[in-house]
Each structure stands twice: as structure tokens, then as C-alpha cells.
């Protein structure tokens, strides 16, 4: 259900404005890029939106490849030239083409179910062997669920970082390696301390609000992404 509401939710959280009828030359150009890349990928043209934020960022979301949304921030359009913006749009369109939103939701759902079942089973086993009673069982269950959830998060975040490399590569193949590298280089130094996206949407943006190089990061470092792209050229 959350996937089917994801476009509406994203627009609500960011205040994005859908560009159904372009009013400016910039909007016409943006829509033409999205339409061209959708045709190359072989899926229906996503909704295109612009949201107001001084931070350069963009995101993609949607329940399926043919029911998707690609949005860019006003800060990104002000900071980047057209080649760099095209690289960013190519990255987001790659997420749509690769079905990353659906895969992430499925992985999260399966792991959540796995964590619940295993935590209950192990909690019951421990409470019976140690004669902890009903209260002891629930304490074990809660502690185990928290522990297993943290471990499962490492798996989800690892996949999130891998999909960023894949989206970078997809953009490089469709719009050019140089454009994608140039876009990432611009993202090294955001122009505002404001978080690029609401915290709940960090994993959907092209960059994370707090650049980290750890197992808890949703995105790889900009440097490692650029290095991976340079290996393609």
C-alpha cells in the first residue's frame, strides 16, 4: 500500500509541483529529457515534479516502472548546468528502470517478517529453557527483535548503497560518464546546511543528507561513486 501512495506522499512531504504542462523553456527541456530516457528504458514517462529547496537533490519513487515520479529540487536546477542535470535525471530514471523502489520494499518486508518470526521463536525457546515465564518471554522477544532489526538494517542499507552504484552506471550508459561524474562533483559541496530531503526519504535522493562512509549509510561516498564511474570510461 505504501508503494501505491508513494508518489502522493513524496509530493506532500516536499511540496513538489508536477509539471504536466511546461510553462518555461527549462521545464520543456526537463520534460523532454525524461521522455527521451523513458523511451530508451522502455517504460511509461514518469511524472516530473520540481520542489523548492536550496539543496541540490532529486529523487524517484513509485509503485511500478509505469507508475513513477521523478522530482528535482530548485536548488539543483540553480546549481547545475544542463549536462549535470541530465546526469542526475539519468540516475533517477535508472532507479525507475531497475525497479529499485519495489525491490527495496520487498527486501524490507521480507526481513521484517523474518525478524518477527525468529525473535518470537528464539524468545520462546529461551524463556522455556530458562523458565522465565510470560514476562521473561516478552522481554526476550523485544530485545531480540531490536537486535535482529538492527542486523537486518545492515542488509537493507548495503543493498541501498549497491543500487546507487547501479543507478550511476545506468545514467552513465544513457547520458554519458562525463555528465554523471560532473553532477556528482557538484554534489560534493551542498550550498545549504538544510537537509536535502525529509529524513524518511533520504534513501530515495541522489545524495544522503549526512555523507557517511559506514554500514549505516544509505549512499556510498561521492568519492567512491566517482571512482566507480571512472573505471567505466
Regions found by a protein language model. Give the residues of each.
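Short pre-active-site segment immediately N-terminal to the catalytic Zn-binding motif
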Residues: 19-22, 74-87
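Active-site recognition of the HExxH zinc-binding catalytic motif
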Residues: 7, 34, 72, 87-95, ...
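Active-site-proximal gating segments in proteases and membrane effectors
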Residues: 42-67, 154, 158, 171-233
